[in-house]
From Swiss-Prot:
Signal peptide: none annotated. ATP binds at G112, T113, H114, G115, K116, T117, T118. Its EC number is 6.3.2.8. HAMAP family: MurC. This is UDP-N-acetylmuramate--L-alanine ligase. It comes from Chromobacterium violaceum (strain ATCC 12472 / DSM 30191 / JCM 1249 / CCUG 213 / NBRC 12614 / NCIMB 9131 / NCTC 9757 / MK).
């Protein structure tokens, strides 16, 4: 690519999926520029590194670019996209640029409906502890690195593979993980679950003949597609039929302790402490262990990488103790969960880490279509908390859908009779609503994929 492409321009450079790729390309010596609607921590960091960042969108911003990279959030009538097409400058999706990056390295792609960001982060941590200095592009900020992307000197590149728009079918990794397959983003697959599952098969089949698929056999849908995958496969799970499995799993002080069993001709066993709560994170760690072993990491490096894992932004991110208005304090945690399956897993992890504590959930639904398609599943998981604050749906560009909004969810939960929800229409009012509702000793979880991510910081600021 480098002999023809010198200047790469990103439309929407501040997006979590775009900034990491831009950062790595800048580190490789390309001229990188980009535009975004607003200034923020990400655009400030890119500008400080020497990336030229424009605000707003204008046709002149693509001057001199050899290629323009867009995300799915960028519309076809964006003035920069129109100008690029008029000038015959190639316009490509971010996944195609990620695929080009993988040509520089040995690509490791992490796919699945849930757990991609955490699993990618755990894998990067394991490879880093092994001295393999991986390049990584992650959908959240890796706490230890202070960023969501890094250009390493090693041969491996670890990145998330996004099924939401089927763009993972652009990638050609040498190793690929599938954590699970659930019904989400079904518009992309004509509302056919069979098409969604086949897309994961097609993704795995894009690996070379020497590639390796790492599959979670605890997930029934992953188990089902396994027979369609002709590449070498390593399985993992809590089930002892897997090639790599965990036994003696127990929670302690916000961590998970377990023994790892590896079937590799002989049986290898070793103890492990994962610095994350939840059985779902044990599964995520097992896939990172499988990748680590495949890449030559020692058991000691794997143990170090997982026991010292410092977390990733908005994935069970702890904000510590916050002053409660009734005296004492409550524990504040923030999480990106926005699908009922991942919400249930996170809330189960909270219950395990903080037994016998009242659980207050402040949830912002994400997308009207998801709320409509999974309405009863949302009602079920929301009804399992002790106290509930519910905001209006974060639209993410969608038009409202009747009976698939925040008020409808609140009514349905109320009818169930297990918890009395408080509807907070404007997310800007959520920080004060949390302080009004939280009691001494509570565990408060803010959750969702939209603007709720700004709420915990405002809660701590208001509490003083």
């Amino acid at each position: 690519m480098k002999h023809r492409v010198k200047h790469i321009h990103f439309v929407g450079i501040g997006g979590v999926g775009m900034c990491g790729i831009a950062e790595v390309l800048h580190g490789l010596g390309y001229t990188v520029s980009g535009s975004d609607m607003a200034d923020g921590a990400t655009t400030k960091r890119l500008a400080a590194e020497g990336v030229r960042v424009f605000f707003g969108h204008d046709a002149t911003y693509v001057e001199g670019a050899d290629v323009v990279v867009t995300s799915t959030a960028v519309k076809a009538d964006n003035p920069e996209v129109l100008a690029a097409r008029d000038k015959r400058i190639p316009v490509i999706p971010r996944a195609l640029m990620l695929a080009e990056l993988m040509r520089f390295k040995q690509g490791i792609a992490i796919a699945g409906t849930h757990g991609k960001t955490t699993t990618t982060s755990l894998t990067a941590s394991v490879l880093g502890a092994a001295g393999l200095d991986p390049t990584f592009v992650i959908g959240g900020k890796l706490t230890a690195a202070g960023t969501n992307a890094k250009l390493g000197l090693g041969e491996f590149l670890v990145a998330e593979a996004d099924e939401s728009d089927a763009s993972f079918l652009h990638l050609t990794p040498v190793m690929a993980v599938v954590t699970n397959i659930d019904a989400d983003h079904m518009d992309t697959y004509d509302h056919s679950f069979d098409k969604l599952k086949q897309a994961f098969v097609d993704f795995l089949q894009r690996m070379p003949f020497y590639g390796r698929a790492v599959l979670c056999v605890d997930d029934p849908n992953v188990r089902e597609i396994r027979e369609r995958v002709t590449k070498p496969v390593t399985t993992y799970g809590l089930d002892d039929s897997a090639d790599i499995y965990a036994e003696n799993v127990r929670a302690a002080a916000g961590q998970m302790h377990f023994d790892v069993v590896v079937k590799n001709g002989a049986i290898t066993r070793f103890p492990l402490v994962l610095n994350l709560p939840g059985r779902h994170n044990v599964l995520n760690a097992l896939s990172a262990i499988a990748i680590g072993l495949e890449c030559g990491a020692s058991i000691e490096a794997i143990q170090k990488g997982l026991s010292e894992f410092a977390g990733v932004g908005r994935r069970f991110q702890r904000y510590g103790e916050v002053k409660a208005q009734d005296g004492g304090s409550f524990t504040l945690i923030d999480d990106y969960g926005h699908h009922p399956v991942e919400m249930a897993a996170t809330l189960a992890a909270v219950r395990g880490a903080f037994p016998d504590r009242r659980l207050l959930l402040a949830f912002q639904p994400h997308r009207y279509t998801r709320t409509r398609d999974l309405f009863e599943d949302f009602v079920k998981v929301l009804s399992g908390v002790d106290a509930l604050l519910l905001s209006e749906v974060y639209a993410a560009g969608e038009a409202p859908i009747v009976a698939a909004d925040g008020r409808a969810l609140a009514r349905a939960v109320r009818v169930g009779g297990k918890v009395e929800p408080l509807f907070v229409e404007d997310i800007a009012d959520m920080p004060q609503a949390i302080l009004d509702a939280a009691r001494d000793g509570d565990v408060v979880v803010t959750m969702g994929a939209g603007s709720v991510g700004a709420v915990p910081g405002k809660v701590t600021a208001l509490a003083g």
